[in-house]
Swiss-Prot record:
It catalyses: (S)-4-amino-5-oxopentanoate + tRNA(Glu) + NADP(+) = L-glutamyl-tRNA(Glu) + NADPH + H(+). Gene3D superfamilies: Glutamyl-tRNA reductase, N-terminal domain, NAD(P)-binding Rossmann-like Domain. Catalyzes the NADPH-dependent reduction of glutamyl-tRNA(Glu) to glutamate 1-semialdehyde (GSA). InterPro entries: 4pyrrol_synth_GluRdtase, 4pyrrol_synth_GluRdtase_dimer, 4pyrrol_synth_GluRdtase_N, GluRdtase_CS, GluRdtase_dimer_dom_sf, GluRdtase_N_sf, NAD(P)-bd_dom_sf, Shikm_DH/Glu-tRNA_Rdtase. It comes from Nocardia farcinica (strain IFM 10152). It holds the Pfam family GlutR_N. The lineage of its organism: Bacteria, Bacillati, Actinomycetota, Actinomycetes, Mycobacteriales. One of its GO terms (biological process) is protoporphyrinogen IX biosynthetic process from glutamate. Keywords: NADP, Oxidoreductase, Porphyrin biosynthesis. The active site is at C50. This is Glutamyl-tRNA reductase. Belongs to the glutamyl-tRNA reductase family. During catalysis, the active site Cys acts as a nucleophile attacking the alpha-carbonyl group of tRNA-bound glutamate with the formation of a thioester intermediate between enzyme and glutamate, and the concomitant release of tRNA(Glu). The thioester intermediate is finally reduced by direct hydride transfer from NADPH, to form the product GSA.
Amino acid sequence: MSVLLVGVSHRSAPVSVLEKVAITDADRPKLIDKMLASSHISEAMIVSTCNRVEVYAVVDAFHGGLAEVGELLTRHSGLAMPDLTKHAYVRYSEAAAEHLFAVASGLDSMVVGEQQVLSQIRGAYATADAQQAVGRTLHELAQHALRVGKRVHSETGIDRAGASVVSVALDRAAQVLGDLAGRTAVVVGAGAMGGLSVAHLARAGIGRIIVVNRTIERARRLAETAASYGVESSALELDRLHEAMSAADVVLSCTGAVGAVVTLADTHRALADRDRAEFPAGDRPLVFCDLGLPRDVEPAVAGLPGVAVIDIESLQRDPAAGAAADDTAAARSIVAEELAKYLAGQRMAEVTPTVAALRQRAAEVVEAELLRLDSRLPGLAEPERDEVARTVRRVVDKLLHAPTVRVKQLASTPGGDSYAEALRELFELKPGAAQAVAAPMEITAIGPDRTAGLADDFTPGHRLDFEQHLGEEGKPA
């Protein structure tokens, strides 16, 4: 069994494609159930954020698993297979682990070094685990990835470029508005991103925060959090969004809803109210930070006078969205080190059952020979028989000690699983003595680039996409 990753992210696809592939919290359990019901998938986890959707699946065959995940994503997104393959990337086995470690470290984020992705991976794991979709393989992979992310953030300065997408969005808003201190902000959505927005706004010295949400109770709770930071705050239901916007300087939205939340009609109403107020719209810009995926702000809003829209796609071009080169290099070094540890542990886990099976086989042979001795020498005294038994067992243990210790050492090296395979072949151990591994033919389909450098993860030389493996109908090529 090996881990297959199929993903679409801000690096590989435009926002229009990401919006279609986006998986909501409500959809995620349904898609996991469908994967578990398929023929080749035994474990599954979906990481879905504002700028990425990644499916991690433990599969018994590369091509079969890829076909099933690809079909699932095309049905969910409504995209034709050729359209999906243009923007999807595939990682397998070691490369899948390397990618998740990089994601957890913030190396693959739109804002390099942001930490929110750690909680998103933790949430993805919790959702999959609650559905009993996580076994040993994904458990160890996800937990190790979380440890890698924590280590990178504690030992490097990779997050100095900005704690999250929110911080960069607010920097862009400040370029339009000037200092944010004392201004009024509207936060649309009371989820994790809403909470992050409130924290960043408070640190920026915002004067007032209005939280808008479909559920007023959640809006009030987040408003109370804002108040605990010493910021004047209030809460409104979503149908009163235009009222909040009429008083705002900046609106941050990330609801995860399907369809526009900030509509052209509501924005027109808000701007009309501002025109009747003390400050005309032309003298008081209204800035929208649309952090939602799918987008929360209707595209036509960006064309209104006095309005600026900062969205996920524009943030990709922000020069402030990168960490210092030395911090990034240090983070990559940690990822490489931890990947080597993880892979060594996985190889060891694969060889341990084989060693145990070998010792069990030897013990069975010893017992069989002792029984044969009893039948041949029925008059053998008990003390002599015990001494013979101890001697035979010592001989067997000494013969097995060196090869079993050595095979465990070799198992931690690249290609070490071949030694365990040799033991299984030489001693005719049962196939179930160790986990099955992917056939060599399937592994070589990945090519020599399975451990490609993280910096060029999506360049043509390093990217592996569906088209190498699937036909137009999503069947194995």
